Design a protein with these regions (language model features):
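Membrane-embedded alpha-helical bundles of multi-pass transporters/translocases
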Residues: 2-467
């Protein structure tokens, strides 16, 4: 396993890739519902339809992108070059998505659908190869957790930068023109994100190569990946795991603005405090899994989160200091499973190669990314639909008691139920510490034997050529 150790520079470089991704996608997770309803001017229910409809297209684009990544052959590897090729388009479409044209309502609806779709496609094209990189940089499960911990600390720094600067920059650039402010603020953040992707490209390396390269058709790869029973289960975990946090994130601006009655400046502080908590949670993941199996840590953290989150419903939202402290602690707990989740994806990819003899990392991660995006869409749509159901009115000077109650439910009880469901799904996985030791040992022998066989065949071929 000595060759599988990663330098701190490479771990930071890998983390910078997701930092670049999340400084953009984080803006969507934190602000897209609020932006579309209160700035862009769309109806809440329509926002829900928008977020869900694009996921139908992802069902086609995600596996195609996974297959393309698996079949990429370049001097940079299979997955690294995509960071270089897609960084600029991803940044560009994020700016266009946060641009509000002065058009008719119907034209703006079309514009919103088109730009959100283009952003989603480029997100797929850069994120599937990026996520796949974590599997081929090292085969050591502990190094994978460490790498993912660095990754989510860097994500935390990027999200902190986002939460501290987006709203103030929007005010500074736009003044009374909030639409212009959001556009200019996103331009700055998108440029930073693009540079982060390029730094990641320059610092990481691919080390793990499949014993047998896949040259099969996409249809055959899709059929083979379903033979990995753990892959099917982690797809379900991906869907369930993303929903609670995103529902709360999407509801946070509404909770701070309408329930707590605070300003956008306070919202910046509140969200930033939560991000700091998430960074601490990312660092705790490595500490906890050094002592306990990651599946056990994942399960019990979600049980505690379910109780803690539901309890938020009963706290007085005007007890500002108490709410801030509890929100900080909640985010520490919330982030602990994130590095574990992504390292489990790599473990499941190893399990698939161990069980079937075929490694199709791009397809495997495209499925996970698709279910992650479905989870984000379901969560975002749920926020939009429930706000509409409870009578939320973006143009009102004050919200009704029903609307306020709906916001509090979205911030507390509904995520709590999601955490409980996630804990149940974790129990379906069997890639624990003991099994992974066996898998790594078997795969190392298999790759070594295949490498020796290739060398022998090349030697015999060269001897035959010389004799001829």
């Amino acid at each position: 396993m000595a060759d599988n150790r990663l330098s701190i520079k490479e771990k930071i470089g890998y983390g910078m890739g997701d930092a670049g991704c999340n400084i953009i996608i984080g803006a969507i997770m934190l602000f897209v519902n609020y932006f579309y309803t209160d700035i862009f001017g769309l109806a809440p229910a329509l926002v829900g339809v928008l977020l869900l409809s694009v996921r139908v297209i992802d069902a086609v684009t995600d596996p195609i992108m996974g297959a393309l990544a698996d079949r990429t052959r370049s001097k940079y590897g299979r997955f690294r070059p995509w960071l270089l090729w897609i960084a600029f388009p991803y940044a560009l479409f994020s700016v266009l998505m946060f641009t509000t044209p002065e058009w008719t309502y119907n034209s703006k609806v079309i514009y919103a659908f088109v730009t959100y779709f283009l952003l989603s496609v480029t997100y797929t094209a850069i994120n599937i190869p990026y996520c796949s990189l974590g599997t081929v940089m090292t085969a050591d499960p502990k190094e994978r957790v460490a790498c993912q911990s660095y990754r989510f600390v860097m994500v935390g720094i990027a999200t902190l930068l986002l939460s501290l600067t987006l709203l103030p920059m929007a005010d500074w650039f736009g003044g009374a023109d909030k639409a212009k402010g959001y556009q200019m603020a996103m331009t700055v953040l998108a440029f930073i994100g693009m540079c982060m992707f390029l730094f990641c490209f320059a610092t990481v390396r691919e080390r793990i190569h499949p014993a047998v390269q896949t040259n099969d058709e996409l249809k055959k790869d899709l059929k083979d990946v379903w033979k990995n029973d753990q892959w099917v289960r982690i797809l379900l975990l991906t869907l369930c795991n993303v929903c609670p946090g995103f529902i709360r994130m999407a509801a946070t601006m509404y909770y701070v603005t309408w329930v707590m009655g605070q300003s956008t400046h306070f919202a910046t502080l509140f969200i930033s405090l939560g991000v700091v908590g998430m960074m601490i949670g990312s660092m705790l993941a490595k500490v906890l899994t050094d002592r306990w199996c990651k599946l056990q840590v994942f399960f019990w953290t979600n049980i505690v989160l379910a109780i803690f989150s539901c309890a938020f419903y009963f706290f007085n939202p005007h007890a500002t200091t108490l709410i801030m402290v509890l929100y900080f602690l909640l985010n520490i707990l919330h982030q602990i499973p994130s590095p574990l989740h992504w390292s489990l994806m790599s473990d499941v990819d190893d399990y698939g190669e161990w069980k079937t003899g075929k490694r199709i990392t791009g397809i495997s991660f495209s499925g996970n990314l698709f279910f992650l995006k479905v989870g984000l869409a379901v969560a975002g749509a749920m926020v939009g639909f429930l706000l509409s159901w409870y009578g939320y009115d973006a143009g009102a000077k004050a919200q009704s008691a029903s609307a306020l109650n709906g916001i509090v439910l979205l911030f507390s009880v509904i995520p709590g139920v999601g955490y409980l469901i996630t804990a149940g799904v974790v129990r379906l996985l069997k890639v624990d510490r003991t099994l992974m030791r066996q898998i790594q040992s078997d795969l190392e022998k298999r790759r070594s034997n295949y490498s020796e066989l290739n060398e022998y065949q090349e030697l015999k071929t060269s001897e035959h050529v010389r004799k001829a």
